[in-house]
Structure formats: C-alpha cells, structure tokens
Amino acid sequence: MRAKACGWGLLLALAGCGGFVNGDLRTGTVKGRILGVEADVARVSVMGHSELRTTVAADGSFQLDGVPATSLELFVVASRTRAARKSVVAQGAQVTDVGDIASSPGAFLTVRVSDESGAIPSGVEVELKDTGLDRIKLEPGVGEARLGPLPTGCYELEVKADDLEDVEEELCVREGEEQVRAITLPTDDDGGGDDDGGDDHGGRDGG
C-alpha cells in the first residue's frame, strides 16, 4: 500500500508541474499524399492557421507538425490548375494520416481594384485570408490580381491600398470557375491614420 501511495503522489506531482507535456496533447502531426502534383507549386496549409503550411515532395507526400488537435480543413494547391479542401480531425500527440487527396479543377479569381474616381491606387495588396496563400502586392500602376487555383468553397477577400479604406468581402467559387470581382476602395476619412498605429494603409478592417 505504501508503494501505491507514493506512485499516486508522483502522478499528481507530475500533473501539477506539467509532466504530461500538455502542449503535445494539444497538437499533433498531419500527413498525407496529394495525387497528380506539380511539386514546384504544390503546397498544403491549415485553413484559419495560415502559419501552418508546407511544401510537397515530388511524390506528393507532405507533413504538417504542430497542428491543433481539433476538426479542421486543409487547403491544398496540387498544381497550377488543380486544388482541393480536405476535412480532417487531428489527434493530439499523434500522427493523423489523411491518405491520398485527389484534386479537382480549381477556380480562378481576378480582382480589379480602383478608388472612387476610377483610378488605380498605389500600394495595392490583395489577400484571401486564412488560406495560407501569400498576400499579393501589386506593382505601381497595376490594378489587377489573379488568384488561384482555388478549391470549391467560400473565402474572405481583403484588399488594401495606400491612404484608402480597407475592404473585406466574402465570396464563393465553384469548380473550374473564372470569376471577376471589382473592388472600389473608398476614401479614408481618417486621413490615413489608425488608432493603434500598426497599419501602414490606415484602413479599418471590414471597410
């Protein structure tokens, strides 16, 4: 009985001091293989966690570490024209193998940006939030960006430019669709300043 009592005391002490490595239980690893990849452009990211993304090996295999142990969705770019979204339940402190992921023809979104006078603003940035895709920064005088391939689904588009209000819009795309979205950025009535000083564009989220 004395040995058992000591054992339970040790377990309780470890639990109190983090001996169970709680961080590992909250995250895990997700791996799988994308079919028909073009490895030079293929990538996988966790939607809503854009910092969690990885490239893909020549055989289509990938591995993502530090994935939250919960239900989530993978955003997959398989090639220059194909993409997919894959639901997965990641397990804490384990490797979750999602198996093979087949892609479909992706949608392409063309975003045309102007100010209220119809002119092309400077410092235009276009982003599909929470997808892991890189934010596109347009060259001066360029008011159009093309995003894709995008798997079927809905996304939040964010557009910014110097000294204008930010605009956010929700949009949905279908398999293989070519969609054009015209965005007009309104004048920033605050004169380019923002409350916390952290946004060079001075726009307010949500436009």
Predicted regions and their residues:
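Sec-dependent bacterial lipoprotein signal peptides
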Residues: 1-16
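Beta-strand-rich domain onsets/edges
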Residues: 17-29, 38, 94-107
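Short, ordered, surface-exposed loop/turn motifs in non-cytosolic proteins
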Residues: 28-50, 69, 115-134
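Hydrophobic loop/turn residues within beta-sheet-rich immunoglobulin-like superfamily modules
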Residues: 37, 67, 101-103, 149-150
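Short, acidic Ser/Thr/Gly-rich low-complexity loop/linker segments typical of extracellular
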Residues: 48-63, 130-146
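Short Pro-Gly-centered beta-turn/loop motif in secreted/extracellular proteins
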Residues: 63-73, 79, 142-156, 161-162
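Structured interaction patches on ligand/partner-binding surfaces of diverse proteins
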Residues: 78-98, 162-188
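Ser/Thr/Gly/Pro-rich low-complexity, disordered linker/stalk segments of secreted
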Residues: 188-207
